[in-house]
UniProtKB/Swiss-Prot annotation:
Cystine connections: 63-105
Gene Ontology CC annotations of this record: ribonucleoprotein complex; T=3 icosahedral viral capsid; viral nucleocapsid
Major localization listed first in the record, in broad terms: virion
The organism's place on the tree of life at top rank: Viruses
Chain intervals with Basic residues compositional bias: 11-20
Domain notes per entry: The N-terminal arginine-rich stretch does not seem to be the major RNA-binding region that allows formation of an infectious ribonucleoprotein complex.
Keywords: Acetylation, Capsid protein, Disulfide bond, Ribonucleoprotein, RNA-binding, T=3 icosahedral capsid protein, Viral nucleoprotein, Virion
Species in which this protein is naturally found: Peanut stunt virus (strain J) (PSV)
Signal peptide region: none
Modified residues (N-acetylmethionine): 1
Function in brief: Capsid protein. Probably binds RNA and plays a role in packaging.
UniProt name for this protein: Capsid protein
Length: 217
């Protein structure tokens, strides 16, 4: 009887030990399920983030075959009424290290701050490197008819519907090395344009370069 009792007692720990693998398997399955869910979320998030293959802001279309785009932000500084702000386009390294790659188009998209309550004219012009971007030199660029002008004005909801303009540069054979000759000109028409009242988002669509997969967007 004693031996039978001791035998029963000896089996209980074994039953307990046999249950550990079951608990471990359940934990492992739960961990795998959570990991798979996280991986799906990461993949979904990555798919929605801008990449070099992501549709550009250019009319919500994808880049032309063999092309990608580089984005820049231009923030006009304080500009008095009747005066202008100018800034040349300088593409970052390593894009600028491939000056012979073709540029197909440039898009300018305006994002106003909540305090913006004026009217601005914006244009993109190719100007010699020695050309002065001072106000007295550039106003005529808005009236000579040689380049399209985006006229952007304050609206009650804060964002004008037509807030972007596209410049097709492919007919003139523009290359990356030519971009420093292009300047964004902003004319403050009705009031003083304060610092950071407006942001100009610039998308430059150009041929892919060898290290394109490593470029930030």
């Amino acid at each position: 009887m004693a031996s039978k009792g001791s035998g029963n007692g000896s089996r209980r720990p074994r039953r307990g030990r046999r249950s550990f693998p079951i608990k471990e398997d359940a934990h492992a399955r739960e961990l795998r399920a959570v990991t798979a869910q996280l991986n799906r979320l990461v993949a979904l998030t990555a798919a929605r983030m801008p990449t070099l293959d992501h549709p550009t802001f250019v009319s919500s279309r994808k880049c032309a075959k063999g092309y990608t785009y580089t984005s820049l932000d231009v923030r006009p500084t304080k500009t008095e009424k009747g005066h202008s702000f100018g800034q040349r386009l300088n593409l970052p390294v390593p894009v600028s290290e491939f000056p012979k790659k073709k540029v197909s188009c440039v898009q300018l998209r305006l994002n106003p701050s909540p305090t913006f309550d004026s009217t601005v004219w914006v244009t993109l012009r190719k100007l010699p490197l020695g050309y002065s971007l001072a106000s007295e030199s550039v106003f005529k660029l808005f009236t000579d008819g040689l380049s399209a002008v985006l006229m952007y004005q304050h609206v009650p909801n804060g964002i004008q519907r037509d807030n972007k303009i596209i410049y097709d540069l492919s007919p003139v054979g523009t290359e990356i090395g030519d971009m420093s000759e292009y300047a964004i000109i902003v004319y403050s028409k009705d009031d003083t344009l304060e610092d950071d009242e407006i942001l100009i988002h610039v998308d430059v669509e150009h041929q892919r370069i060898p290290s394109a997969t490593a470029l930030p967007v």
